[in-house]
Amino acid sequence: MCVSRLVLLFGLLLCVGAQLSNAQHWSHGWYPGGKRELDSFGTSEISEEIKLCEAGECSYLRPQRRNVLRNIILDALARELQKRK
């Protein structure tokens, strides 16, 4: 009886785990069945952020800890002021 409950629990956990996991992974430009988008070979798409990083203006790579802390404090103060009104 204990073994059958254990097998049932294991099977249930396996089914739930398979549903919750992201087992299917598709790379960029690939579709299900191994088909690839043909237009992606001819054009090279470089985003504006990458162009800015090459120019040395990469703001998202710099540490923003001071700004984050300042924004948290300002948001907290704004909430307090709204509560008082």
From Swiss-Prot:
Residues with the Glycine amide modification: G33
GO annotation, cellular component aspect: extracellular space
Localization annotation: Secreted
KW Flavoprotein (keyword) present: no
Molecular function as annotated in GO: gonadotropin hormone-releasing hormone activity; gonadotropin-releasing hormone receptor binding
Domain of life assignment: Eukaryota
Annotated InterPro entries: GnRH, Gonadoliberin
Residues with Pyrrolidone carboxylic acid modification: Q24
Principal localisation: secreted
Keywords for this protein: Amidation, Cleavage on pair of basic residues, Hormone, Pyrrolidone carboxylic acid, Secreted, Signal
Signal peptide segment: 1-23
Family: Belongs to the GnRH family.
PANTHER family in the cross-refs: GONADOLIBERIN (PTHR10522), PROGONADOLIBERIN (PTHR10522:SF8)
The protein's role, per its UniProt record: Stimulates the secretion of gonadotropins.
Protein name: Progonadoliberin-2
Recorded name of the encoding gene: gnrh2
